[in-house]
């Protein structure tokens, strides 16, 4: 990781999470790449005011992106997620938009919907609806959104601990007590959260 200033995000991050096989599911490896490519300065010539690289050539992209673009003959863009499977790939944009399939015929028919969605309903409104009618959970249900949020937050804490393997038990890092300091914010006097 390359750092900006204390308390800031990293200039560039590469993180890998490994999830073991469980309850009828295969093991999964998740790799996260962001920020500027190693060696590219983090300055106004290379990065805009909200931290987005001005050119794709400056981005810290996974090495496999160019290989997949050549294989499937289409651009995968520079922001979003790529799911690599045995039959091909699916790429989604940073907001769940811009689906790209490789090979293109991978997308033959729409899969069944697994989670109910309210058209035109934003997250806070959907959350309030679920409070009023608990028989139908939120579209962004805590059953999967809480583990997802934990994964992302661990991705923020891990680079601060340095380049190493960290083991997580659901509450703390079990193999590095020093890394646990990054799991909670230290507030200035008068700004503490109560309770």
Ranges and model annotations:
Residues 1-138, 149-170, 175-182, 186-195:
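Glycine-rich, aromatic-lined ligand/substrate-binding cores of catalytic
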């Amino acid at each position: 990781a390359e750092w900006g200033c204390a308390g800031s995000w990293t200039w560039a991050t590469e993180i890998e999470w490994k999830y073991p096989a469980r309850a009828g599911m295969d093991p999964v490896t998740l790799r996260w790449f962001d920020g500027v490519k190693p060696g590219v300065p983090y300055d106004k010539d290379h990065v805009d005011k909200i931290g987005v690289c001005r050119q794709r050539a400056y981005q810290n992209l996974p090495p496999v992106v160019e290989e997949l673009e050549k294989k499937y003959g289409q651009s995968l863009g520079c922001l979003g997620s790529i799911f690599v499977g045995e039959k091909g790939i699916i790429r989604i944009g940073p907001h769940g938009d811009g689906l790209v399939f490789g090979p293109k015929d991978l997308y033959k028919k729409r899969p069944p919907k697994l989670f109910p969605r309210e058209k035109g309903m934003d997250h806070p409104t959907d959350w309030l609806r679920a409070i009023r009618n608990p028989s139908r959970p939120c579209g962004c249900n805590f059953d999967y959104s809480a583990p997802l949020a934990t994964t992302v937050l661990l991705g923020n804490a891990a680079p601060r601990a340095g380049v190493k393997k960290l083991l997580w038990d659901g509450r703390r890092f079990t193999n590095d007590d020093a890394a646990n300091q990054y799991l909670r914010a230290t507030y200035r006097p008068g700004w503490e959260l109560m309770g």
